[in-house]
Regions:
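Anion-binding and metal-coordination hotspots
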Residues: 1-147
Length: 147
């Protein structure tokens, strides 16, 4: 909603489709008001689709490969398309992490890498919070000047 990164994980010999449900369950435990989530095609599996539908009110999980008529209808629905457009913000956050130093880890070992990733996510969230506070203050100033 506000662009914060709510969950991160360093994956070791794991694929996206094996982690989707676990990742959402952990996030839902921390953020009980989470109602929906958007994923890449790599996260799709029939099991993920059904299990995630039980956890969340709305799941955007595009199917891999050729779509059936029913799946095509679902993926062309207005809500699905709108959510997919918003998914670019997720990709943008990942890109921002890379642009602000996560593309090259200066720590050594797995523990150092995990720490580096966690601190990068924290720094990005602080940056987003700062931007939101600046925007709020800017709106206040514009209202004062208009009055």
């Amino acid at each position: 909603q506000f662009g914060f990164i709510l969950h991160h994980r360093v994956m070791l010999q794991q694929t996206d489709d094996k982690l989707a449900v676990v990742m959402i369950q952990e996030t839902k435990d921390r953020f009980e008001n989470l109602v929906g989530s958007s994923f890449d095609r790599g996260f799709y599996s029939p099991e993920n689709k059904s299990q995630l539908a039980e956890i969340l009110d709305y799941v955007v999980l595009p199917k891999k490969g050729r779509l059936s008529v029913k799946d095509k209808e679902i993926e062309q629905s207005e809500q699905f398309v709108e959510s997919r457009r918003k998914h670019s913000a997720v990709e943008s956050s990942i890109n921002a992490l890379e642009n602000h130093g996560l593309d090259r880890c200066l720590d050594h070992g797995l523990h150092g890498f995990e720490r580096y990733v966690a601190l990068s996510v924290l720094a990005r969230n602080i940056q987003i919070l700062g931007h939101l506070l600046q925007q709020k203050e800017l709106k206040k100033q514009k209202r004062r000047e208009a009055a």
